[in-house]
Amino acid sequence: MTTQIYQVPVVSNGLRETESILQIVDSLEKLEKVFNDMYSTISARVSHEKSRIDNVANRLNNAQHKVNQIVGSKQAITVFSSAKYPADKKWGDYVPIYSGKHKLPFKPSHYHGLNSEDSPIKKRPEDSYLDVNDLVFIEKSIDTTSKEVEVKEGLGRIPAQIPSVSNLLLFNTQENPYKKYSNTLDNLSGGDGGEDDYTIFGDQLSKKKRLGDAPVTVKDGDSRIDAENVKIGYEPGTFEIPVYNFPSILPLPNVAENITWAAESQSIAPSQKATLNLLPTYDNSNSGSAPVNQSSGGDNNVNNNNNNNNSNNSTGIMQPPQPTNAPPPPPPPPQSANAPPPPPPPPVSAPPPFNPPSVNSNNDDDDDDDDDNGGGGGPGGAIGDLLADIRRGHKNRLKKADVGGDNGDGEDNKPPPVSDGGGGLMGDLFKKLALRRQSIATTKSTKKQSKSKKEDTDDQDGESDTDSSEWE
């Protein structure tokens, strides 16, 4: 769409005076309207662009004011940037001023007569045009006399289509061949100097211009440079590196001094400070009860062993040491309804009296020997036997029962009562335990007899030694 939307009528020639005046007035009015419209449009665009410039200037002033407030402060400053990076600015196409306006229709002025009434045009005599013809002739004669007579000395008229000014000039000269041209002018012909270097060009003498020297590739040819004689490697020189001593903090202007400043704001990842309870926590009192009881039980066993050893040493009988690293006893099995309740524990104040070894040993000795051998000496099985483990679990209860039998009841050699309700798992286990105890009792009785004989011989040897020492 064309941007030329205004049209101004031009006063035509050959009109009467009144028509000429009216057309002149119409043309001036139209020109004034066009002028006002153009300048109002331009003023509106200028004011719009000026408002944009003022907005940018205000933003610059605000930024400069903030910078001026920061300048001079020696404290560290936190600068917060937007979370989203600003998008690329989209530059819009330039909109012309008159792009939204359309070309106005042209209304020429038409005047046909001086009178307002419709009257036919009267033919004027030819004498009335003589003065006008004289004026036209005089104007033409003035134009012809003012023009210079063109002399045909060049190549002719300048062509209508010339791409540039360089095409208008002669090569390597500043002369226009279309205006002045000499056939004797030859820039390529060399001269020896003197008068031959000057050529008559028109009425002036023009000095011939020599061409520049040919390039090296034309003079010497396409010869390649010898690469062996050319050093293209880097050869650094030896020099001492300067040593500078600067303080840790330079007193520079407009530079923060508190380098070790720490932000007081909340971290962007607060979950790092939280401690996660990934592992279960245990109470120290509950968790340490088992090992404490175990250690206390071990200490009690050690004390009991020491007491037994001391008592045995006092009577001259050596007892085998009891195991102190025995595993903790398993929980007791559930008792049946027909089983009698366990006997009460013995009094703690007075320990039970020690009985000398004899052929018919009690069940408490059997239990001690069984503990020493670990259940591996009998014909029943090995240490890891299930029945032996169950028996070890009931060791304390059985010992209490045996201690109660030493008071003279005479029932310490009897096996524990077995429930008559056959077919149950616990009943079978108790039967197996009874058989096991009987087999162990028979084997232990023989061991006790051999052991007592050995101790008697040792006592006799000791008495003989004392007698010999007395005689000496």
Swiss-Prot record:
Keyword hit for Amino-acid biosynthesis: no
GO molecular function, one term: alpha-tubulin binding
Domain WH2: 382-401
Record field: compositional bias (Low complexity): 300-314
One BP term from GO: phagosome reneutralization
Assigned keywords, A-Z: Actin-binding
Highest taxon in the source lineage: Eukaryota
Pro residues bias spans: 320-356
Acidic residues biased stretches: 363-373, 457-472
Pfam families: WASH_WAHD
Listed Gly residues bias regions: 374-383
Family of the protein in this entry: Belongs to the WASH1 family.
UniProt protein name: WAS protein family homolog DDB_G0292878
